[in-house]
Regions:
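Charged, low-hydrophobicity low-complexity segments
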Residues: 69-73, 80, 137-150
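Short, solvent-exposed linear patches
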Residues: 5-14, 36-43
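Short hydrophobic alpha-helical runs that function as membrane-insertion/retention elements
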Residues: 127-134
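Short, recurring structural edge motifs at helix starts
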Residues: 1-3, 27-32
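Polyanionic, low-complexity intrinsically disordered segments
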Residues: 2, 17, 42-123
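Hydrophobic side chains in well-ordered alpha-helices
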Residues: 11, 25, 55, 116-119, ...
Length: 150
């Protein structure tokens, strides 16, 4: 028996290994993915097979990123949050949560979106450090934190 190493596995296999979905659900979602050309995680979410937290866990296991909770998002420093415009944050489901002199910690729903990561680096001139969060947690935090800022 081989050891399971999530960093070498596809998202679907991680979700099966973690008991979040069954093989039949993965097969159904993969068939739909051929038609819709969407990310597997989004299809599984749309079908109600997984939760946002299941997807965040799978991303964190696969990519080695930490998960950040909705409560921790709401404790973000507003000066840091405001480094990214509200429109950009909403459009890309990303929120700045912490910074140092050289880095900016981001919470993202899709940590594989390199275009967003590159854009944040250009906007802030800081090296992004990625954390994963659920879509609803990010949307909620964006709404509350940018309301406080405005």
């Amino acid at each position: 028996m081989t050891n399971f190493n999530p960093q070498f596995e596809k998202i679907g296999n991680i979700l099966i290994h973690e008991g979040c979905i069954e093989e039949t659900q993965l097969s159904e979602a993969l068939e739909e993915q051929k038609i819709k050309k969407d990310k597997l995680g989004r299809i599984l979410l749309g079908k109600g097979f997984i939760t946002e937290n299941n997807l965040a866990l799978a991303y964190s296991m696969q990519l080695g990123f930490k998960i950040i909770s909705g409560d921790d998002l709401l404790n973000s420093n507003e000066d840091v949050v405001s480094l990214i415009s509200e429109d950009f944050a909403k459009e890309n489901l990303v929120i700045a949560v912490q910074k140092t002199d050289t880095t900016i910690r981001l919470a993202m729903e899709d940590p594989e979106n390199l275009e967003v990561i590159d854009s944040v680096q250009k906007i802030t001139n800081l090296k992004p450090e990625i954390h994963v969060a659920g879509k609803s947690d990010i949307e909620n935090a964006i709404g509350i934190l940018y309301d406080r800022i405005n």
